[in-house]
Design a protein with these regions (language model features):
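Hydrophobic anchor at the beta1->P-loop junction of P-loop NTPases
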Residues: 349-351
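Short beta-strand-centered segment that lines the nucleotide-binding/catalytic pocket of NTP-utilizing
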Residues: 372-389
Length: 614
């Protein structure tokens, strides 16, 4: 209303001035010499009115409407989410959902959030669990700064869904530090210190990190294309772990810090376990592979993104790529020797791993490795043993649209075991063939397997004992494949191998299935749910773990993934995940000359140009 009154007053003033001139002793008359002056004055006032009317919309948005717990609320622009949530519980409400986006709980609302619904998210949500874990790492890093200011630490993801922390100072005894660090973390939590997200010029932030002797942070900032960057401030401590965090230290309550020589293990509530901390299980086979990956990255100086970039910028690029491929060749050679040493007993080679691990290319390379040792394997596809959907509907007692097509009961396990048993015993078998065009199972090829020819199978259930129950354990050789890159953005921010696989899948789906990045991201949680249910419970039963990561691959994938991810709009529900992937892909120096990559490389399965049928 005040704007409207101002508009009317200004209009009347202009009208009177232009028509009658200024009040004079002789009355309201306008001498000719004043006309041009009045016109000029009126023009200026009109300009003012135009500017005012342009701002009416802006003034109207001083207040926005939001929906909280089913109620419509009017709040001023700039209001924090934490201030509008009814019954806010800092230990329960970790992050929030604003419209389609997940935000921090103390996020400030703006005009673009007008009409959106807001709800808190607890630890049963994946993004809340991630923010919680990130904050826990932040607190532990802060505790080390407070108690042992000269000690440098590094975090990495570890077996049993945990985080591993080690001291980079060779002489530091981490076992003695466990109790002091636990006490300091508890003190910080009890103090309920505010955690504030800041945006600072890169130069100013670099000075802050330099004063704190955070050389790893400075290295990363040198590759940042933007002129400003985010950081988090808690008291006098600054750090950024490349993810959202909680509002204050007091939001953290449930966690575990235990010694695990030569470092410590950190555990936290997992969303897939309904906010429970998983029991720590010693996964010796898987853990050994992680340790080998860590040692190799350390020896070759490929532990962080800046180190990878320096290999590309300063060294011979072809040499770098061939070095990474040579490591895969060496692992395949180790695998071939292990199978050859027991070939008299091994009749079945079972290969499994999570999505986008490179299983198809790997199976072909295992076959060639065995051929080089005089062993002629036979490959059988588990896909050919799928039941038709009508049969699966009866088995699962569900309509077609609700079927769990990853369930083991979608496979004809009985027929598969019978065919395996007969083949291993030297009989001729006519295999089934599943026609995915018609959705029907038909007759396939007829084969007989020689005594020295192991059968290779690959699929999500390949390591499940139920699938191959007719074959004695000593006659099976199980292989688990997954990328286990022990690489960090910086010392406190390990790269998730899950995100690496998602980037691989985005690139593959675009290249071979004409599928946009948003669709792949939409499907990803369902893929992950299937992995937790059908793959991870059986990984420790593997006789061999193959690490399919290549230290240079994200430099190659970046050139394809980044443009696709940037097409996802802020208002799209996939934006949060897309933006997270963009945030660390942008730091990699791109490799654009794909001709340097061998045609049998595992990465060819995702970018194309493979010599194998993928």
């Amino acid at each position: 209303m005040p704007v409207l009154f101002l508009f009317i007053f200004c209009y009347l003033f202009i009208y009177i001035s232009f028509t009658f001139g200024y009040p004079m002793k002789t009355g309201f008359s306008c001498p000719p010499k004043k006309i041009w002056h009045n016109l000029l004055h009126s023009a200026k006032m009109c300009d003012i009115i135009i500017k005012l009317t342009k701002n009416i919309d802006k003034l109207r948005y001083d207040m926005i409407e939001i929906k909280v717990n089913g109620k419509i609320k009017k709040v001023p622009v700039g209001t924090r989410v934490i201030d509008v949530l009814e019954g806010y519980d800092k230990k329960r409400d970790i992050v929030c959902q604003v419209g389609a986006q997940v935000k921090e709980i103390n996020y400030a609302l703006s005009e673009k959030h007008d009409g959106m619904e807001i709800k808190p998210l607890g630890l049963s949500h994946s993004e809340a669990s991630k923010a919680y874990e990130t904050t826990l790492r932040f607190l532990i890093a802060m505790a080390f700064r407070n108690v042992y200011p000269n000690v440098k630490i590094r975090f990495s993801y570890n077996a049993s869904r945990s985080v591993y922390c080690e001291a980079l100072n060779k002489t530091f005894n981490m076992s003695r530090a466990v109790e002091p660090i636990k006490n300091e973390v508890k003190r910080l939590i009890d103090a309920d210190l505010k955690i504030e997200r800041l945006s600072l010029p890169v130069e100013e932030l670099s000075n802050l990190y330099a004063k704190s002797n955070m050389k790893d942070k400075l290295d990363v900032l040198s590759y940042r294309p933007e002129k400003s960057a985010h950081t988090y401030k808690c008291g006098d401590y600054y750090n950024y772990l490349h993810s959202y965090m909680v509002a204050s230290t007091g939001c953290i309550s449930d966690y575990s810090i235990t010694p695990y020589s030569p470092g410590i293990i950190i555990q936290y509530p997992r969303h897939e376990l309904n906010a429970e901390i998983p029991e720590f299980v010693e996964e010796s086979t898987y853990g050994r592979t992680l340790q080998q990956a860590y040692k190799w990255a350390k020896k070759t100086k490929l532990q962080t993104i800046p180190e990878v970039n320096r290999k590309i910028e300063r060294d011979n690029l072809l040499e770098f790529i061939q070095m990474c491929e040579a490591r895969h060749n060496a692992m395949l050679s180790d695998l071939g020797r292990a199978i050859e040493a027991d070939i008299e007993n091994i009749r079945l080679i079972a290969i499994a791993g999570p999505s986008s691990s490179g299983k198809t290319t790997f199976c072909n390379r295992v076959r060639i490795e065995l051929l080089s040792r005089g062993i002629e394997p036979v490959m059988i596809s588990l896909d050919d043993y799928y039941f038709e959907k009508e049969v699966i509907c009866k088995i699962q007692n569900k309509p077609r649209e609700e079927l769990d097509l990853e369930h083991i009961n979608c496979l004809d396990v009985e027929l598969f075991n019978k065919d395996l048993f007969d083949l291993i015993n030297g009989e001729e078998v006519t295999l089934p063939k599943f026609d995915f065009t018609t959705g029907k199972r038909v007759k396939g090829r007829t084969i007989r397997v020689e005594n020295n020819s192991p059968i290779i199978i690959e699929g999500i259930h390949a390591l499940n004992e139920r699938l191959t129950a007719s074959i004695p354990k000593h006659r099976k050789f199980k292989i688990y494949i997954a990328p286990q890159a022990q690489m960090n953005i910086d010392d406190h921010s390990p790269l998730s191998t899950t995100n690496l696989r998602l980037i691989r899948r985005i690139v593959r789906d675009m290249s071979f299935r004409n599928c946009p990045a948003a669709t792949t991201i939409d499907m990803w949680q369902s893929v992950r749910d299937g992995e937790f249910k059908w793959i991870y419970p059986h990984q420790e039963g593997a006789d061999f773990v193959f690490n399919s990561s290549l230290s240079y691959e994200l430099c190659v994938l970046k050139t394809r993934a980044l443009p696709a991810l940037k097409k996802i709009k802020y208002t799209d529900p996939q934006y949060l995940i897309a933006n997270r992937l963009i945030k660390y892909l942008k730091y990699f120096t791109p490799i654009t000359d794909e001709s340097l990559i061998p045609c049998n490389s595992l990465i060819r399965e995702f970018i194309g140009g493979s010599c194998f049928k993928v």
